[in-house]
């Protein structure tokens, strides 16, 4: 089954970690209980430069597969995801450099057959005075419209967006619980924003 089918059928928890002791425990549990398993790594954990775990996507997948075989978890039970793929690891560079590296990052995940791709371009780069939904959307369009990405992304479970707090920690270091009312307001605002962009950028939507 594909990720969306599993979610629709019941639910599919995502374990976002690059810690192989944790992953080993998850594999054992899923194998014993015959459950599907989605393991995700973030762009600052695993990327083409190695990330803070010193793992490229290729190396990460090789380690995952070796561990899977050791525990005898079926290949059909395992799904891999890339989380917050975008400029996060290179936010201290200009947006031009960070986006170029983001394309290379996502392409490296696609080349290793990751099933779930989460594109997040909401991070402010070195030369960004501010960032808003329009900028985030334009950057996402540029990445997904890239020739090397466009041909490989269609059969993936694609997630676009960000979350609270921003990936990489909350800037003001405060823990805030978002109310249901605020979530509904933000969801409506984003829905209206997407509808307005749909009218302005039809070519992008119709080609994806």
Residue ranges of predicted features:
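Active-site-proximal beta-alpha loop/turn segments in soluble metabolic enzymes
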Residues: 45-49, 84-92, 121-134, 157-181, ...
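Alpha-helix-loop-beta-strand connector modules within alpha/beta enzyme cores
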Residues: 54-82, 132-156
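Acidic, His- and aromatic-enriched active-site or binding-groove loops in soluble protein domains
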Residues: 136-147, 178-194
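Membrane-embedded hairpin module used as a gating/binding unit in multi-pass transport
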Residues: 163, 189-208
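Active-site mouth loops of central-metabolism enzymes
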Residues: 9-21, 81-103, 173-181
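Alpha/beta catalytic barrel-like cores
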Residues: 1-72, 76-77, 89
């Amino acid at each position: 089954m594909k990720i969306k089918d599993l979610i629709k059928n019941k639910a599919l928890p995502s374990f976002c970690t690059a810690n192989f002791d944790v992953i080993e425990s998850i594999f054992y549990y899923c194998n014993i209980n015959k459950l599907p398993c989605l393991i995700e790594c973030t762009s600052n954990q695993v990327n083409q430069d190695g990330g803070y775990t010193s793992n490229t996507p290729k190396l990460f997948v090789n380690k995952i597969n070796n561990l899977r075989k050791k525990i005898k978890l079926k290949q059909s039970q395992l799904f891999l995801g890339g989380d917050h793929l975008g400029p996060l690891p290179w936010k201290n560079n200009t947006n031009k450099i960070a986006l170029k590296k983001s394309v290379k990052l996502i392409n490296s995940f696609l080349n290793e057959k990751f099933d779930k791709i989460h594109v997040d371009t909401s991070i402010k780069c070195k030369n960004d005075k501010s960032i808003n939904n329009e900028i985030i959307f334009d950057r996402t369009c540029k990445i997904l419209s890239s020739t090397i990405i466009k041909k490989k992304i269609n059969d993936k479970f694609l997630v676009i967006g960000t979350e609270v707090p921003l990936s990489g920690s909350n800037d003001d270091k405060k823990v805030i619980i978002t109310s249901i009312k605020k979530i509904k307001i933000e969801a409506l605002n984003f829905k209206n924003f997407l509808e307005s962009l749909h009218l302005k950028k039809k070519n992008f939507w119709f080609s994806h």
